[in-house]
Amino acid sequence: MSRIANTFAKTKKENRAALIAFLTAGDPSIEATPALLDSLVENGVDIIELGMPFSDPMADGPAIQKANLRALAAKTGYNDIFRIATEFRKRHPETPLILMGYANPMTFKGSDSFAASAKEAGVDGIICVDIPPEEDATLGVAVREKGMDMIRLATPTSDEARLKIILDGASGFLYYVSVAGVTGLQQATEASIDAALDRIKAVTDLPVAVGFGIRSPEQAAAIAKKADAVVVGSAFVSCIEKAVTNRQDPNAALEKLAKELSTAISDARKEAAL
């Protein structure tokens, strides 16, 4: 099994959701990123999403937009991202690593070249935000040919017909974007997420991860009762920004939030069963 499949098998056996954390590569610097990733893994994060910096991150809210700008200001380039991934894989041989971003930084050297570099660096899956399935004639094919997962996104407006298109060629897990709009600004109601999960799980056996707008342990725990994974991005990125602004250690801030989220997610189903 793949590292992603192994992780979901493990969390299922432990009767808990997985915690997926997003950080932007190179934020606040290329040199700082490896230790920040270590802080997440060592404090309960199960899967890492590493964002590829881009100048026009249209699906992202203010926190991640600013993280992209900080990473670009730090001159984080294509090769830096794969170097960070390669080093991560050496330190964490079992933790899934996903590259997440936009078509432009992923494919400007060609889909085959990108997929080959990702595979060589130990990447497990790819999330490309702005290539819809029906327009994905090259990237998804290249990713799958290298044995990596092409992870698709579904939204509240994805009906059954649309879900079938999204799921065609999808693997690893399905990422459910729980609100319409950009990351980090809103949160869907628990009832609407539960209904969406029922609808999605009726048409796929893939694990379903829920993200967008999850900022607190309480929000994460509510979603973890039913979702297979909880994705947190803007909250972690905001921790980095706040720590850097206040000249504090961003690792300590990430460790604290990761522990709180991990504990809340691990306890969610135990409390629901009482």
UniProtKB/Swiss-Prot annotation:
Care to name a GO molecular-function term for this sequence? tryptophan synthase activity
Taxonomically, the superkingdom here is: Bacteria
Give yes or no: UniProt keyword Nucleus: no
- What does the record give as its pathway? Amino-acid biosynthesis; L-tryptophan biosynthesis; L-tryptophan from chorismate: step 5/5
Q: Which InterPro entries match?
A: Aldolase_TIM, RibuloseP-bd_barrel, Trp_synthase_alpha_AS, Trp_synthase_suA
Cellular component GO terms held in the UniProt record: cytosol
Q: What is its EC number?
A: 4.2.1.20
- UniProtKB keywords: Amino-acid biosynthesis, Aromatic amino acid biosynthesis, Lyase, Tryptophan biosynthesis
SUPFAM superfamilies linked to this entry: Ribulose-phoshate binding barrel
Q: Which PROSITE patterns match?
A: TRP_SYNTHASE_ALPHA
* Residue ranges the record marks as coiled coil: none
HAMAP family listed in its UniProt record: Trp_synth_alpha
**PANTHER family, A to Z:** TRYPTOPHAN SYNTHASE ALPHA CHAIN, CHLOROPLASTIC, TRYPTOPHAN SYNTHASE, ALPHA CHAIN
Q: Say what the protein does.
A: The alpha subunit is responsible for the aldol cleavage of indoleglycerol phosphate to indole and glyceraldehyde 3-phosphate.
Record-linked NCBIfam families: trpA
The entry describes its oligomerization and partners as: Tetramer of two alpha and two beta chains.
Protein name per UniProt: Tryptophan synthase alpha chain
Q: Which organism is it from?
A: Zymomonas mobilis subsp. mobilis (strain ATCC 31821 / ZM4 / CP4)
Instruction: Specify the taxonomic lineage.
Output: Bacteria, Pseudomonadati, Pseudomonadota, Alphaproteobacteria, Sphingomonadales
